[in-house]
Amino acid sequence: MAQCNLFYQYPITPILEGHVRNILICTEKDVEKLQSQSSLRLREKIDQGHRDKLLRMRLKTELDALQKKMQKDSDVLNSHLKAIEDALLFTNDGEVNVETKADAQLIPKSPEKLEKFNQVAITPLDPFIRFTDDFRGEMINTFFNNAQMWNFTFGSWFYKLKRVFYNEPGLRRALKLTNVDSLTISKELLAVTVNALEQATVYPIFGSEMSDLEAALCILAAFYSTYENSQIDERTTLVDVITLLPVIFRLLGSEITALKNVSPSGTYFGFNDPSCMKFFVPMRKGKHYAENTFGNHVLIKMLLGRGVMQKIPGEKISQNFDVEARLHGAIKNDVLVYWTYQLMRPKLGNNVPIFIHDQHYLRSGLVAIESLFLLWRILNSESLFNKRVGKFLLTSIFPQLENVDFAENNFEAGNIQNFEYLMHHYVVPMYNLQNDISISTLFPGLVAVCVNESVRLGWEHKCAGAPSDAVQVQSKENPFVEYIRAQMEQQADVAILEKHDCILFHLENGLNITLSFTLPRQRLFAMASSLFNVNDTYDFIYFLVLGFLPIPAVI
């Protein structure tokens, strides 16, 4: 068997055997490093995927816009080609003389030169008004182009502005002011003043993702959704909410009346700002106002009571919701967040702000609700078919119109819908034209009346807590004078912003004062009549929309 040993044994004896520690060793530090590198690469891939998705979405949007533009240009070109072909058919010799005026009109124009017209209606008594881009600016131009044969007055408030600026040589030349004794004002002064009225609720510093009107519509939609059989669902748009405003305001009025019966302060529409507050922008992290700023606001109490809002950070009014969160582990779904996302998602995508965190949206939305609610209470209080006592006629701006008297003596209307008509034929077209439009841009006349109501009482932040039985002297001049002067003199941006926010604070206080009255119409009409030539509902509606009311002056 010795010869067979090699069959069972290795022919070569191994010299070096494998060591017991001759293995791959990976420490915990190495494992963590590998995990970190893998996580980093995975994060980079995820971020790259998000970037690619955003780029694809942006590319799709640009391609869709380009496709629509090309389709529009193609339709325009086809229409012009058809017009040229029709002209060629009627030509005897088969040639077209492009130098003639008639044929020159058939030459296709570039899409940039094609005019796009929009139209709105203010009252059911008057025809639609067509304009191109700037409704109010074009109305001012039309008025001054057609008013050369007459002298017009715009009220004592505009005349006082003229007297103030007339005494300053630089502003007098810039605004082209002459003849200080005349009640008429220049086109430049009217345009600058109306622009200041339009910009009252437009915040000029940071780019807001939504306007105050959109914020108000989101809040009202969330409020309306808490009622049974409400005409609102996931397919509802902001335009639909505008058409539902009369129904919503009836419910809102009932809720406010109920709160008024429970508490004497149930009609307080103001904010508890700190003394000497100068700027509208929140000072706490740029998002939150001071503690308990919204504590006494009647709309906040109503929204919390209806379950529309669950909590406002740092507010004493919402401490009971903290208890609920601790007991049940979570707070109920926020109705306001849900409807804000539903209504604003088509415009903003997933970047929809949350009002309880970005509180400037909440505050501006509440002010817009107050403005619309005040209009609803006033405009439907009197029919336009009653016998008129006002002197404004649309022929003052459009002389080609005929004066038609629709008034009836002893007219009784069972269903007045002045507010509904204005929303449907004015607010909706203006919002479709410019979806970031604000309340002051829609109704500059309302800004003028409410601000002057606050200024007349001498209100300021530092005296906001003064006793109600004491009268307050006015320590400052007209805030619009300071704002216009700051703009014309090109003062520092901070100075202009401070004067702009002063107007906004006066607007908030003026709305609070007016809405606290049982009959706000008499209060506003008394102010508008003494300052802006307003004498009836027809005059008031046009003043709300235009921001001025020209009346022929007898020299």
UniProtKB/Swiss-Prot annotation:
GO terms for cellular component: host cell; host cell nucleus; viral capsid. InterPro entries: Herpes_UL25. Its main location: virion. It comes from the Viruses. Pfam families: Herpes_UL25. It is found in: Virion; Host nucleus. Residues 1-47 are annotated as: Interaction with major capsid protein/MCP. Keywords: Capsid protein, Host nucleus, Host-virus interaction, Viral genome packaging, Viral penetration into host nucleus, Viral release from host cell, Virion, Virus entry into host cell. This is Capsid vertex component 2. Heterodimerizes with CVC1. Interacts with major capsid protein/MCP and triplex capsid protein 1/TRX1 at the pentamer vertices. Interacts with the large tegument protein/LTP. Capsid vertex-specific component that plays a role during viral DNA encapsidation, assuring correct genome cleavage and presumably stabilizing capsids that contain full-length viral genomes. Participates in the interaction between the capsid and the tegument through interaction with the large tegument protein/LTP. It comes from Human herpesvirus 6A (strain Uganda-1102). Belongs to the herpesviridae CVC2 protein family. Coiled coil: none annotated. One of its GO terms (biological process) is viral penetration into host nucleus.
